[in-house]
């Protein structure tokens, strides 16, 4: 699983080449730590021995979070993402979860993909950042 995510992070993260190794290492480390905190199940579709689509179901009591959905661009449009999502929803039901949540960017295509599969928006978040060392005066 980590191989698919690592390829995706290396391809898609908006970070400098100099920082990429450290950022990817931190993300992989985060996944290992998450595995120890909640019940994490990795779900995947393999083709010719290689993971082409994957997601994670994280169960904490009666709530499940579906995260890290990723399909290799060369394997999209073949139903692999649907298979991963369906398996996650089935597993959540088996665990007795009455709620499955996920996050999707309101301006990106996955939001519509999830909506077509029955998910509805229930809230929004606001993401912000500041340059390291910037003061409130210099950030204006």
Regions found by a protein language model. Give the residues of each.
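Conserved acetyl-CoA-binding loop-helix of GNAT-fold acetyltransferases
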Residues: 71-73, 77-94, 115-116
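Conserved catalytic-core motifs of GNAT/GCN5-like acyltransferases
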Residues: 101-103, 112, 120-134
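Conserved acetyl-CoA binding element of GNAT-fold acetyltransferases
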Residues: 62-73
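Ligand-binding pocket scaffold of soluble enzyme catalytic domains
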Residues: 4, 19, 26-27, 31-34, ...
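Short acidic/polar active-site loop segments enriched in Thr and Asp
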Residues: 62, 98, 120
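Flexible, substrate/cofactor-facing loop regions flanked by secondary structure
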Residues: 1-64
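Conserved GNAT acetyl-CoA-binding A-motif
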Residues: 92-105
């Amino acid at each position: 699983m980590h191989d698919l995510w690592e390829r995706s992070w290396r391809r898609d993260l908006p970070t400098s080449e100099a920082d990429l190794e450290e950022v990817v290492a931190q993300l992989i480390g985060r996944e290992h730590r998450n595995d120890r905190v909640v019940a994490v199940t990795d779900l995947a579709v393999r083709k010719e021995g290689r993971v082409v689509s994957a997601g994670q179901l994280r169960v904490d009591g009666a709530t499940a979070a579906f995260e890290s959905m990723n399909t290799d661009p060369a394997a999209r449009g073949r139903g692999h993402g649907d298979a991963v999502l369906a398996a996650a929803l089935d597993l959540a039901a088996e665990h007795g979860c009455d709620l499955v949540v996920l996050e999707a960017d309101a301006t990106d295509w996955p939001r519509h993909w999830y909506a077509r599969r029955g998910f509805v928006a229930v809230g929004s978040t606001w993401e912000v950042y500041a340059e390291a060392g910037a003061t409130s005066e210099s950030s204006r």
